[in-house]
């Protein structure tokens, strides 16, 4: 079977799945200035930076674990809390307008998992699944934003991009978050809960402009509790970085 035929069959299969899920879950719509009483928005300031906390009553989250995350209210509107990244080169992406969110085109073609209780979503795009820096600049600081208004004890489950790396679970443990309290988007891409909380991005989707409050927050949590051996120099291996004598360095 040729690659073209395989590609066409894959496209047909995807369209069938999308249309079947239209029958199960109504396709979300864009709010466009309509009032939505199932979504509350709290405005706050951290070190002169403006942020928002979004609270959804009986809301949903749909994500592809990469470029698209849609926060959907009980009234089936896509919230401004949503993420819709689009690449502008081979590596980097920009967050687009809510109107560009993929669920407005394809709906939510995954079975939904219901969670009894409250969820704090820390979803921050595909890079935060594996990238050490994105984890600490995009994911963890969202907890600080949430804590400006609410107590973490209110949260039943934390919705995270991944916990497959050791540093992810370790970093969460410093905040009292245990593995049993976590749901990952790798396993569940469509969830619903009695309450869902989300926040705006800690550095406004600009990883090169991490806010000073965010760095101080990380320092307060992790540095004072670090009992590891001190080193003169630390080498961080980045996935997009190539070093010719890396094997010798690791030895």
Model segments located where?
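The feature primarily captures lumenal catalytic ectodomains
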Residues: 2-251
């Amino acid at each position: 079977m040729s690659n073209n035929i395989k590609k066409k069959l894959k496209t047909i299969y995807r369209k069938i799945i999308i249309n079947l899920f239209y029958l199960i879950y109504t396709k979300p719509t864009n709010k466009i200035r309509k009032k939505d009483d199932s979504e509350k928005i709290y405005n706050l300031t951290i070190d002169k930076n403006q942020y928002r906390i979004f609270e959804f009553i009986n809301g949903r989250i749909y994500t592809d674990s990469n470029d698209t995350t849609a926060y959907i209210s009980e009234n089936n509107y896509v919230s401004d809390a949503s993420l819709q990244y689009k690449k502008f080169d081979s590596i980097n992406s920009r967050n687009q307008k809510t109107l560009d969110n993929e669920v407005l085109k394809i709906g939510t073609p995954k079975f939904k998992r219901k969670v009894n209780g409250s969820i704090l979503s820390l979803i921050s795009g595909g890079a935060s699944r594996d990238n050490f820096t994105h984890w600490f600049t995009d994911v963890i600081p969202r907890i600080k934003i949430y804590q400006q208004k609410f107590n973490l004890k209110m949260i039943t489950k934390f919705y995270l991009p991944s916990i497959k790396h050791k540093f992810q679970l370790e970093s969460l443990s410093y905040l009292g978050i245990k593995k049993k309290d976590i749901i990952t988007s790798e396993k569940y891409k469509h969830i619903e809960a009695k309450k869902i909380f989300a926040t705006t991005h800690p550095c406004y989707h600009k990883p090169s402009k991490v806010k000073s409050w965010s760095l101080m927050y990380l320092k307060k949590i992790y540095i004072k509790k670090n009992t590891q051996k001190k080193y003169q120099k630390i080498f961080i291996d980045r996935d997009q970085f190539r070093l010719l004598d890396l094997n010798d360095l690791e030895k």
